[in-house]
């Protein structure tokens, strides 16, 4: 890495996996017939995405939205709104199905179809985040074949890097900076408590500062249906402000971080 723009010490990106109903169907296909379960995803599209966009506009931040193709088909007006606000659109599957559950030919079809749908909104899609951050043995080869610039799925570094023998960059992520492990609740399992905003604030602030001190890139992963709850949306804005106050951190899209891969 040659350094971050403007002499910044580190980079950061705010990313949003706009899964809507698809995440619940991907978790259990039987959920397709459970309106109560799916309504959690509908909230993400109906209420939370506009709240998130308002926060980003107030803070002057350009983010990356990873969107399954089927979500774009179901909620095209929301995708158009995201595009109109100038945010990066990136690939998140056609359905929210892990590549590990698909034969190679079906994974390829999902990759091609999802991208075609997203690019029908007038944007170039160069980034890929798989559902559940899972990569199959053929995923990186498919990304290379179809000209994707970057993947944002692995947890083996804190700096963007290039895959060996590949033109595909990796923009690393980590569960600690994902809202789902802290806030997600699935009534089918009842196995975890819902964390408080203050617990997550402490964890995220310490992680961001630690990555900054090491000169890395912090990629925050949020889901509108999770972070966009009324008691959390204010926390999102406060956390973005906290990162902005670290004036030696360059805030960018995931695609822009990928351009600085070693």
Regions found by a protein language model. Name each.
Residues 1-127, 132-176, 198-220, 228-262:
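Catalytic alpha-helical scaffold of carbohydrate-active enzymes acting on polysaccharides/glycoconjugates
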Residues 125, 185-196, 223-225:
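Surface-exposed cleft-lining segments at the edges of enzyme active sites
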Residues 169-192:
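Glycine-rich, positively charged active-site loop/lid region within alpha/beta enzyme cores that binds
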